[in-house]
Amino acid sequence: MATSDVKPKSISRAKKWSEEIENLYRFQQAGYRDEIEYKQVKQVAMVDRWPETGYVKKLQRRDNTFFYYNKERECEDKEVHKVKVYVY
């Protein structure tokens, strides 16, 4: 299967915050499912991350505007249930 053909097999909602959920939240705020879809659409090999935390630092939306994120956690507890977790 080609990389561009990767589709999720299932989806669930996040129950509690983790570093993985934090990064998924950032991708979904920018309009992508996750890092896999972002890399497919934008044709990039690496995503800008904060070296201290490993969280996503900057994402380019589909309309070519940029989202910039802080080093600290941005996904509040009340937002966690909105994050979709895709399984491939």
UniProtKB/Swiss-Prot annotation:
Q: Which InterPro entries does this one have?
A: Meiosis-expressed_gene_1
Q: Which GO terms describe its cellular component?
A: cytosol; manchette; nucleus
Which keywords accompany this UniProt record? Differentiation, Meiosis, Spermatogenesis
- As annotated in Swiss-Prot or TrEMBL, what is the tissue specificity of this protein? Expressed in the testes (at protein level). Expressed in the ovary. Several isoforms have been identified differing in their 5'-untranslated exons. These isoforms show different tissue expression. Some are expressed in various tissues, including lung, liver, brain, testis, oviduct and oocytes. Some are testis-specific.
Q: What happens when the gene is disrupted?
A: Mice are viable, but males are sterile, producing only a few sperm that are morphologically abnormal. Spermatogenesis is dramatically impaired at the stage of elongation and condensation. Spermatozoa exhibit failure of flagellar formation, disorganization of sperm axonemes and deformed heads.
Q: List the disulfide bonds.
A: none
Q: Name one GO biological process term.
A: spermatogenesis
Q: Where on the tree of life does the source sit, at the highest rank? A: Eukaryota
Checking Pfam families in the record gives: Meiosis_expr
Please state which protein family the record places this protein in.
Belongs to the MEIG1 family.
Q: What does the record note on quaternary structure?
A: Interacts with PACRG. Interacts with MORN3.
Protein task: Essential for spermiogenesis.
Entry protein name? Meiosis-expressed gene 1 protein
Q: Which organism is it from?
A: Mus musculus
Q: Which gene encodes it?
A: Meig1
